[in-house]
Amino acid sequence: AIGRTWQCGTIQLDMLMPERFNLEYIGEDGEKHRPVMIHRVVYGSIERFIGILIEHFAGAFPTWLAPVQAVVIPIKTDSEAQMVYAKELMAKLDAAGIRAKLDDRNETLGYRIREQQGQKVPYMLVIGDKEAESNMVSVRDRKDREEFKNPVTAEDFILYAADEIKERRL
């Protein structure tokens, strides 16, 4: 992403360490010889690869790879109807295999949306009284794609997101 090269696992020939440790062996000719060490370093390969992914996507992972794929944001966290619907929606998302979280903190709606944008969550599902009454969601897409004519039914969003995850779309 920023043009650097990365090294994951390595295999190295080391001629210095045997000398430092004064390592020797007796060869077929009966003489002492200095060995050459072979190092294999796979330790950290997974961590390095994750670092490469984070850098490549600048933290904005594709939906299938994102740790949190959708966040449910009720407009009024003190509204019983919105909170009941938010929890029902969370159960539906979970049943569909969509990793979601509920942002029901006592902060302003704008603050919660900005924070989720900063976290680069692929989808924000904003629900108010109208959405709760009609089983709909207002979708805020991280990429500002035009797939959603808001509001959409919760089922339509779930089908779309589950398909995107299954196909591993970028």
Segments the model singles out, each with a brief description of its role:
Residues 1-170:
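NTP/phosphate- and nucleic-acid-binding module
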